[in-house]
Structure formats: C-alpha cells, structure tokens
C-alpha cells in the first residue's frame, strides 16, 4: 500500500493530476486507488465493461494523465497519449506492469499537503440521455460517508443486541466480507472496500460473480458479510449446491441497487443464519442514503430503510418545484 503513492507521485507533474483505473476486481485495483488518493490526486475508476470508444471518451473528458488497466481494457488504446500501466495479473511486454512501476520506490508514505475539500474521485454514472456523467467527490465527502456508515451500523447492531438477537459487530478479527460487486461502483469501493479499511475487515474478492463460487468462498473463508444486488443473495438461496456448504458464518446479507421482493426477505431470513439488510444511495452521495436491517426490515420488507445521518429526508409536499425547463 505504501509504494504506490511514491511511484504515482514520481510520475506526476502535479499532485492534483487525474489517474484512471479500469480492470476487473483484483488487489492491484485497491493498491492503485490508495496510491492515487494518498497523494491528493483524483482517482477515476471506469466501468470494466466499456469498449475502447467509451474508455477514450472518459479519459479525454477527465483529462487523465496515467491509466492502470488489465490487458483486455488496454486493448485498442495504442494511439491514446497517456501513460499506461498494466496489472501484473495480465502481463504484456508492451506495457509496464504495476509491480515494475512500484519496485524502485520507498515504503515510506510521501509527505504531501491534502485539504479536506480536495477532489479525490470521479465516478462515471449513466444519465437518462447522452454520455455518462462524471461525479466528483472530495476527500471529506468520502471519509464522512464511511464514518456515517460506521455510525449507523453500530446503532443497528446495538439495537439488535438489546432485543436479544444475534448481531454483527462493527469490528473483530473474525469479520470478512465477500466483495462480489465491481470496484468501479460505489457499492464495491465504498461499502465493501473502504469500510473494510476502516474497521479492519478481511476482504474476500471475487473477479466476477458466480453463485457457486461464492458459496465455496463463504464456506472456506468464513465470510460474515455479503453486500450486492438483491438477486445475488437470492441466487445463493436457490443454488442447487447450497446445502453442501457451511454458511453459518454469514451474519449480514446486504442488498442495494434495487428493492427485494417482500417474500424474498422472509425466505432469506428463514433459510440463513445471517439476516437480510437493504440500503439505498447514489453515486453522487458516495452510496450514502438509507439503511435497514434486523427485525425492522423483516417487519417492513418493502422499506428502503431509515435515512442515515447526515442525509435529510425531504417531503415533496413542502417543495416548490420549477415549472419551466432550465
């Protein structure tokens, strides 16, 4: 983790430069992220399903100076005037690997001045029309979001404990999350990755989703948390090999990106030792919005959850909305 900031800084003309990452989930994605934001530069995780034209648009739009990617994502970008670093998992002699990029640099964290309101990330999110929109987030915005998640998670756990229910503590050496969604999305990067850094939770990373492989990883790695779209936990429940594995380590079956059918909530709670949860957020809010879990979610399976501080719920009946297009 300490070498990427040094090597990234040495390749930069300014600490505020923009660096882009596009690869499937792998540990070097995380190393690159920490190296970029650790020097006060802007990290731009791009959709790994994009094709060359879409990648080129985003790179030119955000004026990226350096690109970390795997072989498949770097393909077709030969004419793009940008420094390209390839993941060590997909070596190619045409590019410098991440291992080579960091080898000659110190393990000491560089001394750089970073303001709380300096930009840290740009996540591209599709709009209703036109090209994807780049969403800027600051160092303060991301850190405050992670602490807000920690706060509400602690409150929910304490409530379950008072009610005599089994609960998932925020910290502990036994905690492990199955990172089963893309790191280029705020659910993967914030809820799974960055929260794990804060609380010291083990990350069990999947390159891509496969319900059968997920069951095996939960069994082998004693996974306690899983957060993804509701379909993923539903696939675990209905997989033909489910009963071949010990899934009793699971404590949280998190979901987001869409509602769960009420009947699914009930069946998940009845068939897993872990309890289902749900959340709602936006790229623009670093995934922060609402959360629900435990008995409250079981009793109100159609809910999107309670508003998480510092998010404020606003009633549209008290708003005067514009009547003309701006």
Report residues per predicted region.
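Short hydrophobic alpha-helices that are characteristic scaffold elements of the AMP-binding
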Residues: 34-39, 57, 61, 185, ...
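Gly/Ser/Thr-rich phosphate-binding loop
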Residues: 127, 198-199, 220-228, 237-299, ...
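Conserved AMP-binding/adenylate-forming
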Residues: 13-50
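Single conserved hydrophobic/aromatic residue that forms the stacking wall/gate
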Residues: 1, 5-15, 19, 318-326
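Conserved pre-ATP/AMP-binding loop-to-beta segment of ANL
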Residues: 106-124, 131, 168-176
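ANL superfamily adenylate-forming
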Residues: 72-116, 143
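Conserved AMP-binding A3 loop
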Residues: 120-151, 156-158, 324
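Conserved AMP-binding/adenylation subdomain of ANL enzymes
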Residues: 143-179, 184-224, 239
């Amino acid at each position: 983790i300490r070498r990427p900031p040094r090597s990234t800084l040495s390749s930069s003309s300014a600490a505020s430069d923009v660096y882009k990452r596009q690869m499937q989930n792998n540990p070097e994605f995380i190393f690159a992220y920490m190296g970029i934001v650790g020097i006060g530069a802007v990290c731009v995780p791009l959709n790994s399903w994009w094709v060359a034209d879409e990648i080129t648009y985003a790179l030119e739009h955000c004026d990226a100076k350096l690109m970390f990617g795997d072989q498949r994502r770097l393909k077709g970008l030969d004419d793009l005037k940008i420094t390209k670093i390839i993941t060590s998992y997909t070596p190619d002699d045409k590019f410098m690997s991440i291992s080579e990029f960091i080898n000659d640099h110190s393990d000491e964290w560089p001394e750089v001045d970073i303001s709380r309101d300096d930009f840290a990330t740009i996540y591209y999110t599709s709009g209703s029309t036109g090209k994807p929109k780049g969403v800027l987030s600051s160092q303060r915005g991301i850190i405050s979001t992670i602490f807000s998640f920690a706060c509400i998670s602690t409150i929910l756990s304490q409530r379950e404990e008072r009610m005599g229910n089994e609960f998932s503590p925020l910290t502990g050496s036994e905690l492990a999350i199955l990172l089963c969604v893309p790191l280029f999305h705020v659910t993967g990067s914030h809820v799974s990755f960055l929260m794990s850094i804060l609380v010291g939770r083990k990350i069990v990373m999947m390159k891509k989703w496969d319900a059968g492989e997920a069951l095996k990883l939960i069994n082998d790695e004693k996974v306690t948390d899983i957060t993804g779209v509701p379909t993923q936990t539903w696939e675990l429940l209905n997989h033909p090999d489910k009963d071949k594995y010990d899934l009793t380590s699971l404590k949280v079956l998190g979901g987001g990106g869409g509602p769960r059918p009420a009947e699914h909530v009930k069946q998940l709670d009845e068939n897993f030792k872990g309890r289902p949860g749900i959340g709602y957020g936006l790229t623009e809010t670093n995934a922060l919005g609402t959360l629900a879990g435990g008995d409250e979610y079981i009793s109100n399976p159609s809910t999107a959850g309670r508003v998480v501080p510092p998010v404020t719920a606003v009633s549209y009946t008290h708003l005067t909305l514009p009547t003309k297009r701006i």
